[in-house]
């Protein structure tokens, strides 16, 4: 299959050295000025990220509290209770679909919500390691390019290699990856909306041990189907296929019992659809396993808290990096004097750290101001602590 492509008999590598004149002071200053604009954009973006994150977190927390106070659990999932029409309901049950999902090309058939075919091709992959050094007034860059063969699920474009000759990859795969999804999914009498079906993503590898080779030119080894003359010694261009599934929808002697999920959504007839809260958010929750309504909302609150802190950290980091880029020009102005340069670098980083911390806390306080003014005032006071510490250290250094 790989006769038209490069041999994979050995790993190959080569080294390339490039050089350019050492940049002068004005050139470095010009590059730093460009970085200031990028830093300013990053700095401003961080305010938007932090502020909107607080609004999102509070809206989500309010919606979850509202949902917990309103949710009801039907007596049975096998009948539709008219009194729950339009209400937020808590449903627990095994998934069920109307027909099998299949890939007839490989003889795969099973009851599931989703069936994924994952395709990989054996290809050349280029890796590079670079190092820079100064020699005779020149900045030299030494790059070592290494070529190895690996199974990859995406096409690796060998035209972008530093040296394509001897490392050529096919431009397309003979087989494509895809995911089949059941059109109708039920829990008892209730049909899941598309949004709930999308949340069923707990994919598990499908064992191919009991399947036969579907064609003469396809060989099964372990949990892969190989389009190869010899799977033990693949060549560039060879393809292997594996399968995974999510949401087993019927008891199976090999795969186990049907998958059980817990859903919290709005009941509309026999449909489970998104529920709109008073705060303008929507509730459409699916958890894998059997959970009470209280457990589901507790898990969602924990997830919301983790996401909030993660975005706060990302906002702080963006602000810190933006300030570093904006103040980099001061470092460039003194980089000709090694000792003073290092002191300035430490001072600028400390300045960026203090300012980023203070502004992050103030932005968080502004986000909370409308909803929780007392907490906002407390955070605002904490935000002043780094600035006060920084200011009290300055006179001390002058006295030294």
Swiss-Prot record:
Q: Which domain of life is it from?
A: Eukaryota
Keyword NADP carried by entry: no
Q: Which GO terms describe its biological process?
A: innate immune response; nuclear membrane organization
Topological domains annotated Perinuclear space: 53-313, 367-368
As given in the record, the signal peptide range reads none
Residue ranges annotated as transmembrane are: 32-52, 314-334, 346-366, 369-389
According to its record, how does it sit in the membrane?
Multi-pass membrane protein
- InterPro entries from the xrefs? TMEM43_fam
Q: Which GO terms describe its cellular component?
A: endoplasmic reticulum lumen; endoplasmic reticulum membrane; Golgi apparatus; nuclear inner membrane; plasma membrane
Where is the PTM N-acetylalanine found along the chain? 2
Q: Which GO terms describe its molecular function?
A: identical protein binding
The UniProt keywords, alphabetically, are:
Acetylation, Cell membrane, Endoplasmic reticulum, Immunity, Innate immunity, Membrane, Nucleus, Transmembrane, Transmembrane helix
Pfam families for the chain: TMEM43
Q: Which residues lie on this side of the membrane: Nuclear?
A: 2-31, 335-345, 390-400
Q: In which tissues is it expressed?
A: Widely expressed, including in the cochlea, heart, eye, brain and kidney.
Localisation per UniProt entry: Endoplasmic reticulum membrane; Nucleus inner membrane; Cell membrane
Protein function:
May have an important role in maintaining nuclear envelope structure by organizing protein complexes at the inner nuclear membrane. Required for retaining emerin at the inner nuclear membrane. Plays a role in the modulation of innate immune signaling through the cGAS-STING pathway by interacting with RNF26. In addition, functions as a critical signaling component in mediating NF-kappa-B activation by acting downstream of EGFR and upstream of CARD10. Contributes to passive conductance current in cochlear glia-like supporting cells, mediated by gap junctions and necessary for hearing.
**In which family does this protein belong, per the annotation?**
Belongs to the TMEM43 family.
> Which proteins does it associate with, and in what oligomeric form?
Can form oligomers through the transmembrane domains. Interacts with EMD; the interaction retains EMD at the inner nuclear membrane. Interacts with LMNA and LMNB2. Interacts with SUN2. Interacts with RNF26; this interaction is important to modulate innate immune signaling through the cGAS-STING pathway. Interacts with CARD10. Interacts with gap junctions proteins GJB2/Cx26 and GJB4/Cx30.
The identity of this protein, by name, is Transmembrane protein 43
Q: What is the lineage of its organism?
A: Eukaryota, Metazoa, Chordata, Craniata, Vertebrata
């Amino acid at each position: 299959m790989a006769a038209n492509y490069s041999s994979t008999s050995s790993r190959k590598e080569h080294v390339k050295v490039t050089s350019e004149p050492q940049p002068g002071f004005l050139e470095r200053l010009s590059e730093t000025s460009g970085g200031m604009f990028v830093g300013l954009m990053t700095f401003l973006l961080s305010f938007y990220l932090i502020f909107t994150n607080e609004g999102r977190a509070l809206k989500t927390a309010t919606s979850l509290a509202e949902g917990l106070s309103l949710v009801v659990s039907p007596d049975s999932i096998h009948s539709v209770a008219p009194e729950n029409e339009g209400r937020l309901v808590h449903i627990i049950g095994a998934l069920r679909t109307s027909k099998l999902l299949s890939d007839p090309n490989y003889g795969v058939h099973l009851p599931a919500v989703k069936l994924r075919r994952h395709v990989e091709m054996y290809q050349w992959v280029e890796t590079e390691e670079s190092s820079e050094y100064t020699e005779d007034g020149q900045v030299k860059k030494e790059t070592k390019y290494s070529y190895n063969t690996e199974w990859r699920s995406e096409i690796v474009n060998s035209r972008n290699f530093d040296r394509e000759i001897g490392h050529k990859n096919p431009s397309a795969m003979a087989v494509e990856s895809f995911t089949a999804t059941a059109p109708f999914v039920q829990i008892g009498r209730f049909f899941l909306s598309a949004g709930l079906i999308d949340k069923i993503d707990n994919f598990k590898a499908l064992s191919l041990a009991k399947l036969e080779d579907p064609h003469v030119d396809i060989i099964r080894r372990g949990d892969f189907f190989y389009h190869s003359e010899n799977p033990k010694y693949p060549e560039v261009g060879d393809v292997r296929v594996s399968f995974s599934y999510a949401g087993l929808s019927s008891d199976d002697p090999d795969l186990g019992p049907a998958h059980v999920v817990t859903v919290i959504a709005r009941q509309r007839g026999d449909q489970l659809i998104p529920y709109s809260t008073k705060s303008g958010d929507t509730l459409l929750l699916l958890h894998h396993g059997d959970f009470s309504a209280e457990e589901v909302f507790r898990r969602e609150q924990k997830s919301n808290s983790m996401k909030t802190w993660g975005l706060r950290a990302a906002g702080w980091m963006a602000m810190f990096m933006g300030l570093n880029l904006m103040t980099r020009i001061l470092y460039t102005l003194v980089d000709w004097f090694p000792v003073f340069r290092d002191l300035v670098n430490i001072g600028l980083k400390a300045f960026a750290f203090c300012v980023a911390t203070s502004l992050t806390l103030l932005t968080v306080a502004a986000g909370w101001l409308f909803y929780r003014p007392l907490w906002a005032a407390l955070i605002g006071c904490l935000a002043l602590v780094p600035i006060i510490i920084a200011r009290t250290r300055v006179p001390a250094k002058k006295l030294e």
